[in-house]
Amino acid sequence: MFRIGQGFDVHQLVEGRPLIIGGITIPYEKGLLGHSDADVLLHTIADACLGAVGEGDIGKHFPDTDPEFKDADSFKLLRHVWMIVKEKGYTLGNLDCTIIAQKPKMAPYIEDMRARIAEGLEAEISQINVKATTTEKLGFTGRAEGIAAQASVLLQKV
């Protein structure tokens, strides 16, 4: 049996915060605003995994009203989500992600992101795809006001 999930997330770029995407800190003058570390890609992946097993979304599991998750490491949140997936008897088929950002360029960091995500999902790097695109300077991502991400996951019953 297979299950498919999809995720989407957006965070605003602001000064005074580190930029963490896919579990990797990227040197940039701005970072993403959020209750946790605001890792837009890991949040998207967590949502896709939760959706695939019918467990809602990260807001349900890690509410932004709970002080326990203030500045939380999104990699730890992803690991918790993956434990839920495993408890339900699933393993990763593959994951395909897209980061939508005008700036900074993501290409130099994608392989490190793939490795970190594979670690979090107990998978091979070959099961993880991360790509990046711009919106050709259109919309909030095009104006570099924020970063968005999308993910599709295929889970397989063990």
Curated annotation (Swiss-Prot):
One of its GO terms (biological process) is isopentenyl diphosphate biosynthetic process, methylerythritol 4-phosphate pathway. Signal peptide: none annotated. A divalent metal cation binds at residues 9, 11, 43. Pathway: Isoprenoid biosynthesis; isopentenyl diphosphate biosynthesis via DXP pathway; isopentenyl diphosphate from 1-deoxy-D-xylulose 5-phosphate: step 4/6. The record marks 35, 134 as: Transition state stabilizer. Binds 1 divalent metal cation per subunit. Keywords: Isoprene biosynthesis, Lyase, Metal-binding. One of its GO terms (molecular function) is metal ion binding. It catalyses: 4-CDP-2-C-methyl-D-erythritol 2-phosphate = 2-C-methyl-D-erythritol 2,4-cyclic diphosphate + CMP. Its EC number is 4.6.1.12. InterPro entries: MECDP_synthase, MECDP_synthase_CS, MECDP_synthase_sf. 4-CDP-2-C-methyl-D-erythritol 2-phosphate binds at residues 9-11, 35-36, 57-59, 62-66, 101-107, 133-136, 140, 143. It comes from the Bacteria. Belongs to the IspF family. PANTHER family: 2-C-METHYL-D-ERYTHRITOL 2,4-CYCLODIPHOSPHATE SYNTHASE, CHLOROPLASTIC. Homotrimer. Involved in the biosynthesis of isopentenyl diphosphate (IPP) and dimethylallyl diphosphate (DMAPP), two major building blocks of isoprenoid compounds. Catalyzes the conversion of 4-diphosphocytidyl-2-C-methyl-D-erythritol 2-phosphate (CDP-ME2P) to 2-C-methyl-D-erythritol 2,4-cyclodiphosphate (ME-CPP) with a corresponding release of cytidine 5-monophosphate (CMP). This is 2-C-methyl-D-erythritol 2,4-cyclodiphosphate synthase. It comes from Bacillus licheniformis (strain ATCC 14580 / DSM 13 / JCM 2505 / CCUG 7422 / NBRC 12200 / NCIMB 9375 / NCTC 10341 / NRRL NRS-1264 / Gibson 46). The lineage of its organism: Bacteria, Bacillati, Bacillota, Bacilli, Bacillales.
